[in-house]
Amino acid sequence: MAKPFSFKVLATDGRARRGIIDMPRGEIRTPAFMPVGTGGTVKTMYMDQVRGVGADIILGNTYHLMLRPGAERVARLGGLHEFARWPHPILTDSGGFQVMSLSKLRKLTEKGVTFRSHIDGAPYEMSPERSIEIQSLLDSDIQMQLDECTALPAELKEIERAMELSLRWAERCKTAFGDQPGKAMFGIVQGGDNAALRVRSAQALSAMGLKGYAVGGLAVGEPQAVMLEMLDITCPELPADKPRYLMGVGTPDDILKSVARGIDMFDCVMPTRAGRHGLAYTRRGKVNLRNARHADDPRPLDEESDCPAARDYSRAYLHHLVRSQEALGAMLLTWNNLSYYQKLMQDIRAAIETQTFEARGAEITEGWARGDIPVL
C-alpha cells in the first residue's frame, strides 16, 4: 500500500513555516520553490541538474502536455516521471490558466471550457473531470483543481462569478479525483483583489477537507502590495495543518514576503525565462549579461556561489555567449538562476528553524539593494 500524503510543520517563526510534505516518491522540504517543467522539461536543463541544485519537486503543465505529446501517450509510456526521467514528486496545474490566456475562441460554461489549440487550432474541451483525468494519466503526485482565473483589474461581479464557478468546479474535481493513495488534490482560492470574496473562497474550500490549498489569481497585474494584502487575509482562513501554495510567484522579494505570511510552496517561470534572456539572479540582485560593461570582465558572477555556472565562468564569457545567442549561455544562466532560487529557499528554511527569519530576510534584501560589483 502506498505511503499516505502527509504534511507536518516542523518549525515556525512568526507566520513563516518550515515543514515537510511526505509522499511515496519523496519528501518536499518547505518552503519550496518548484522549477517549471511546462512540457515535461525544465527548459535548457537536464533533470539530474534540476535535482542537483536542490529541487525536490517540479511542475508540469496540463494544457501543454495535453496538446503535445498528449496525456494518453504519456500514460502509455509509463507516466510523466518515467517519460521525463524525474522519479521525484511532480505537481501538475489544471490547465485552466493557459486555456484562458493562450487559447483562441474559448467558450466558458458551467460544464467547462471549449477552446482551440494555440498550436494548430484544433478544438478541445476541458471540464473539471477531464482536467483530473489528464493529470491522473500523467500520474502526477499533486493535482490542481480546474479554476477560472480573472486578470486584474476586473469588475467585482466578474470576479465573484469566476470565484463561485471555481468553487463548484472544485467539488467536481474532488469527486473525480476520488481516493488516490499517496497523492493529493489541491483547491485554489480565488476572489481577485476583494477581501470578502477571498475569505468566502478560502472558507468554502477549507470545508471540503482537501489535502492542500493554493492561492491563485495573484501576480496577474496587481501591485505587490495588493497581493500581500490578499495573503494577509487569505492564509489565516486556511487550515494550519495543510500546505499552502502561491501559484505563479515569483520574484525573490515576492517569495520572502509571502513566506512571512505563511506560504509554503511557490512556482514561477521567472528564473528559467530570465536565464534564456541573459539575466542572472545573484545575491547582489539581478545582473544583465547583455550589457557591454561585462565584455572585458574576467570575474565570475559570484565567486562565493556553489554553482559552477556562477563561480567558474567569467562575466566576459557569459556576455559573449548571450550576445552571440549561443545555447550554452541560456543553459549556464538558467543553471545559475535555479541554483540561486534553491539556495534562497534553503536559507529561508534554515532561518525559520533558528528563529532568525526576519533578520536573514533583511540581510538578503540588503544584499540586493547594494547592487552588483563595480565595473572594472
Swiss-Prot record:
Keywords: Glycosyltransferase, Queuosine biosynthesis, Transferase, tRNA processing
GO molecular function: tRNA-guanosine(34) queuine transglycosylase activity
Recorded metabolic or biological pathway in which this protein acts: tRNA modification; tRNA-queuosine biosynthesis
Catalytic reaction equation(s): 7-aminomethyl-7-carbaguanine + guanosine(34) in tRNA = 7-aminomethyl-7-carbaguanosine(34) in tRNA + guanine
Enzyme class at the top of the EC tree: transferase
GO biological process terms on file: queuosine biosynthetic process; tRNA wobble guanine modification; tRNA-guanine transglycosylation
Binding-site residues for substrate, renumbered to this chain: D93, S94, G95, G96, F97, D147, Q190, G217
Gene Ontology cellular-component annotations: cytosol
EC number: 2.4.2.29
Active site: residue positions: D93, D267
Keyword tRNA processing: yes
NCBIfam families: Q_tRNA_tgt, tgt_general
Protein name as annotated: Queuine tRNA-ribosyltransferase
Species this protein is from: Mesorhizobium japonicum (strain LMG 29417 / CECT 9101 / MAFF 303099) (Mesorhizobium loti (strain MAFF 303099))
Species lineage: Bacteria, Pseudomonadati, Pseudomonadota, Alphaproteobacteria, Hyphomicrobiales
